[in-house]
Amino acid sequence: KLKASDSRSFLDPMPEGVPLSELELDKDEKFSTMEEERRKLIAEDREGNATRIAELEVAMNEHSHELAKLKASDSRSFLDPMPEGVPLSELELDKDEKFSTMEEERRKLIAEDREGNAARIAELEVAMNEHSHELAKLKASDSRSFQS
């Protein structure tokens, strides 16, 4: 029998910049239902059920991204939602290397020892907020330069 981790190789390992392991997919009813159906279809007739299996894999991947967006927005609640008047969603923080590096360090420190690492976590949150404001200023100046 396949272990859950073995049968998830088709999933994006870092949806929305969040490691799959942090999404607790086994506890998500919708994901578990799709995963169980996929498992049965594979056991029954992998080739004959290939189309439905592929559809399920796409749906499971999309659902993991939805869960990751929720997790990412929760984990970013300390950020100013409108730095420089620009919505956070427009800043593409997941694609920014500096922000992603700080976010990953923050995530590790929280997982390791939230209280013991509180000072460093707070420093990172301030730096992440400042960086989101820098990105927003760049975005705002870019959009103004295109207007006549």
UniProtKB/Swiss-Prot annotation:
Q: Name one GO cellular component term.
A: cytoplasm
Region described as Disordered: spans on this chain: 1-22
> What ranges cover the sequence repeats?
1-68, 69-136, 137-148
- Localized where? Cytoplasm, Cytoskeleton
Which Pfam families did the record assign?
A: DUF7623 (PF24610)
Q: Which UniProt keywords apply?
A: Cytoplasm, Cytoskeleton, Repeat
User: Which InterPro entries does this entry report, sorted A to Z?
Assistant: DUF7623 (IPR056040)
Designated name of the protein: Antigen GM6
What is the species listed in this Swiss-Prot or TrEMBL entry?
A: Trypanosoma brucei gambiense
